[in-house]
């Protein structure tokens, strides 16, 4: 039997939470207070997955706007949209400023390691 949309989404959320050391937000979106699908420290993640394996996914600006708004409401400083093409691999959409911070942090870690 095929997974329901909720079951497929939950699998993705659990996978993301495990990979980044976060937690799945159970019942996300069902209350005015619980938003986002995964929270890891100050990072708010909204997960989007395809039901069946696909070569493409449509990204909507409204997803990004909503994630940004909800992350601020939950007092999270950063947000990302995690997308899956229906397989067990996730890709992340982030703002340019967050990408710049990540690259600077990565370079700083490399400097310390050398």
Positions of PLM-derived features:
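Catalytic phosphate/metal-binding cores of nucleic-acid and nucleotide-processing enzymes, i.e., regions
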Residues: 1-114
